[in-house]
């Protein structure tokens, strides 16, 4: 694997940076820098800005609107978007649901939904986890019973990310209660405004709103919204989760957060010296940087193989990436000392820029760090708990 920078890739990187400087509004970049949960209008604005450029869905094939980039260009794109503090687009739609639709859905569904996803005309959430079905997803109980040209859906989903913003849900439902757990599941596309569907917020430990619980009470879903074949939904779910776990390494996010820690450590002082000069702190930061670089090279290896074998290492990337994000967030809070624990949300779930701890105001560069560290506790759980991922690694890679 050649790790020397390609001049073409460097030119592409500079093009991305110029685009972000010209197109990203300063107030939006400021919110992104503080790692606020994205506002819906920010998300939609940026998705449409990217779509106008042909960059909204970098991972999609050209035939469905993708830009035709190399794997390395896709990685650089994500890296520069995070470094430039651009808001995340509808990643559930573009990176998870979209690929399922263009791979398994009918031509009519592709024609209807893919353009909407590219332009953020309708945002998406995924209905997988239930109160009794998290890591053991195949035990889900939400039922869908065929009634003429519709399915009647009853049940509950929980931890539904961005459900409060979503217009549509990609949901796993049980259509054959008598079949083996994994064989009686189907995938439905459900309108979040359908009668009988209720979405309720779940405020997490960071006091922000990103997840929800969704209730279905005789919700009628057109049968034409079935993805692929009835009772074949488990295969589509595994495909989707493979993408989620590969993407959850989040190296661009981690590198951006490391740069923020270095900025803080140059300003904050310990024993009269910049914190960055403290040997213990510097060693911890160096260890994180080394581990991040190792993870980045692991991703480069997958990219060099044109993505072959990505599914087999998805669990490894998920485990390493999620644990790194927690370590980085915790170190950032520690760098601020006692002020690092301050959290005060405003009504939109954004972290108040006037956070204080006692009489000591939190500096601008420290706003939201405590909330971020709290939210990062979930990274080792969502997308498949790391304990489950280690079992997958043992079976599929180590052959234990």
Regions flagged by a language model, labelled:
Residues 149-150, 154-200:
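A short core secondary-structure module
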Residues 28-37, 270-273, 293-359:
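C-terminal helix-coil-helix/basic helical segment that borders enzyme active sites and/or dimer interfaces
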């Amino acid at each position: 694997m050649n790790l020397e920078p390609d001049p073409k890739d460097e030119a592409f990187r500079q093009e991305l940076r110029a685009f972000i400087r010209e197109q990203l509004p300063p107030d939006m970049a400021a919110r992104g820098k503080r790692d606020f949960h994205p506002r819906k209008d920010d998300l939609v604005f940026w998705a449409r800005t990217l779509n106008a450029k042909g960059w909204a869905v970098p991972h999609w094939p050209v035939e469905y609107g993708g830009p035709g980039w190399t794997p390395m260009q896709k990685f650089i794109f994500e890296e520069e978007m995070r470094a430039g503090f651009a808001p995340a687009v509808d990643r559930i739609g573009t990176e998870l649901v979209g690929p399922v639709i263009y791979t398994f859905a009918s031509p009519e569904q592709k024609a209807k939904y893919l353009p909407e996803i590219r332009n953020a005309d309708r945002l998406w959430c995924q209905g997988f986890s239930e109160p009794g079905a998290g890591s053991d997803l195949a035990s889900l109980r939400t039922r869908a019973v065929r009634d003429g040209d519709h399915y009647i859906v009853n049940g509950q989903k929980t931890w539904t990310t961005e459900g409060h913003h979503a217009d549509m849900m990609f949901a796993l439902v049980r259509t054959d209660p008598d079949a083996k757990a994994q064989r009686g599941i189907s995938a439905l596309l459900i309108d979040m405004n359908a009668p009988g569907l209720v979405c309720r917020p779940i405020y997490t430990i960071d006091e922000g709103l990103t997840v929800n619980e969704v209730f279905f009470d005789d919700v009628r879903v057109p049968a034409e919204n079935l993805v692929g074949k009835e009772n074949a939904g488990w295969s589509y779910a595994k495909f989707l989760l493979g993408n989620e776990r590969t993407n959850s390494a989040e190296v661009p996010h981690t590198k951006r957060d490391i740069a923020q820690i270095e900025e803080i450590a140059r300003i904050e002082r310990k024993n009269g010296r910049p914190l960055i000069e403290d040997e213990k702190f510097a060693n911890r930061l160096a260890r994180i940087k080394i581990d991040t670089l190792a993870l980045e090279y692991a991703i480069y290896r997958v990219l060099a193989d044109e993505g072959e074998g990505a599914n087999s290492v998805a669990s490894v990337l998920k485990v390493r990436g999620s644990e790194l994000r927690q370590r980085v967030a915790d170190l950032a809070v520690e760098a601020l000392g006692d002020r690092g624990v301050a959290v005060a949300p405003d009504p939109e779930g954004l972290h108040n820029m006037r956070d204080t701890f006692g009489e000591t105001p939190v500096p601008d560069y420290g706003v939201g760090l405590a909330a971020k560290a709290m939210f990062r506790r979930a990274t080792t759980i969502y997308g498949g708990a790391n304990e489950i991922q280690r079992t997958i690694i043992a079976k599929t890679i180590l052959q234990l």
